């Protein structure tokens, strides 16, 4: 069972990530992490007739591949926790419609993967799930159409803008066994720093990442140097620097910080401005890049902090401010478990 220390859930017997899968589109296949994906498609329609159906297909492929790698079937999965950026999380619900797994829809914008992992770990730790699927996705074209402008409009992107990843990530959690350990989770509080610019999500989300990280460090008595990496997703280059500035003001130097939105693409070559974003960005980097490093023991202990801007197309048109949230999970290498006996 989990124990609570402040705002942080600790899992003395950590649930594990038994399997994971990452799917990406054309632009992701042109980036520096291309080799990390299980599957890449040069066709961003993924064989479908529209962008929204393409995202559903991508999420479905990620889920099926994850289950295949775990050598299990949908009927043996207790629950799926999933979400996306489409209205009412239709990419996730339409994908899960085909799998028949009990489904709880989540919305945390780009923070959804950490939200799903934290909730999933709590359910597994409490004995409520033997196998739990945590997954999320995003699609550049679907997100642009919903939140910004149709692609045919040809709007100029600002330097602070980020590129919504066409990607999906899925993890299968189990209460125990072999795999990367989920040792702790801290769920975020909504932060509002009066940002209204929809093309500067990093500025809106950086304070949320700082607030959640500071609470976790206080609750656990940890310091940034205790971790091989502190991953955020997805603040981009602008938001990442703002996070480091905010923490420096608190006396913390974040020398081991890596943002998923900064490593998925080559900003100099791929015209993504401030970097990647979208739930599928940090989810695919987690499943294709971070978890394999932990499995190999290249990294032993990391924090994964996913951030989300909680606006809608309606609140944006009403000129509301953009609140944000960040959820955190602590991940440890299975090799560290062996070393600790």
Task: Describe these PLM feature segments.
Residues 55-71, 117-119, 204-219, 285-290:
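Short, well-ordered amphipathic alpha-helical segments that serve as non-catalytic structural scaffolds
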Residues 93-145, 149-161:
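A generic, well-ordered mixed alpha/beta core segment in the N-terminal half of proteins
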Residues 17, 51-110, 226-241, 246:
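Conserved beta-ketoacyl condensing-enzyme motif
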Residues 89-90, 140-145, 189-194, 311-313:
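Short, well-ordered, mixed-charge alpha-helical segments that flank or form enzyme active sites
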Residues 1-52, 150-215, 219-222, 252, ...:
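Condensing-enzyme catalytic core mediating Claisen C-C bond formation in acyl metabolism
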Residues 18, 82-83, 132-138, 302-307:
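Short beta-strand segments
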Residues 28-30, 91-93, 143-148, 241-243, ...:
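Short acidic, glycine/serine/threonine-rich loops at helix termini
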Residues 107-134, 171-173, 277-298:
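Active-site-proximal alpha-helical scaffold in enzymes
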